[in-house]
Amino acid sequence: MRFGRNNSSCRTALVRMCLASAFSLGALAPALAQAPMALVPVRTIYPGEAISPEQVKSVEVTNPNISAGYASDISEVEGMISKQTLLPGRTIPIAALREPSLVVRGTSVKLVFHIGNMTLMASGTPMSDGSLGEVVRVRNIDSGVMVSGTVMKDGTIQVMAK
């Protein structure tokens, strides 16, 4: 024998309300999440051209299937050099950018070689352009010998020991 009210209809209504609110929050969650942003050129950028903030704009990524590896912040592209043609409205792949060259092929650079407390300096001509940290081949102007070295941030070449 049971005394009291039959609460099954109240419980059912409460469960229905909870489920309805959970589903409505689940539907709102993607809308509340911030959409990813990407940088796109406002005009065609050709290979070898430096990228300035005026040449790009930030847009919302609406394609969920877009591949990763695109620039999303101006600091990622400002001052970088394009390695390929970048079309307006298309995302800018990070792999399509490189650091600006500190040494230019055919110009005169200072070669520096350290061994112990001794430092040797000479003039050389790089055989290719080089950015900070890249290894380039350089011809010593005085002897004609080819050496390899690392491009330093001051534009000199740190020659490697064999």
UniProtKB/Swiss-Prot annotation:
Please name the GO terms of the biological process aspect recorded for this protein, alphabetically. Answer: bacterial-type flagellum assembly
The entry assigns this protein to a family as follows:
Belongs to the FlgA family.
UniProt name for this protein: Flagellar protein FlgA
Q: Which Gene3D superfamilies match?
A: 2.30.30.760, Antifreeze-like/N-acetylneuraminic acid synthase C-terminal domain
- Signal sequence coordinates: 1-26
Q: Which UniProt keywords apply?
A: Bacterial flagellum biogenesis, Periplasm, Signal
Q: Whose protein is this, by species?
A: Agrobacterium fabrum (strain C58 / ATCC 33970)
Q: Which domain of life is it from?
A: Bacteria
Q: Where in the cell is it found?
A: Periplasm
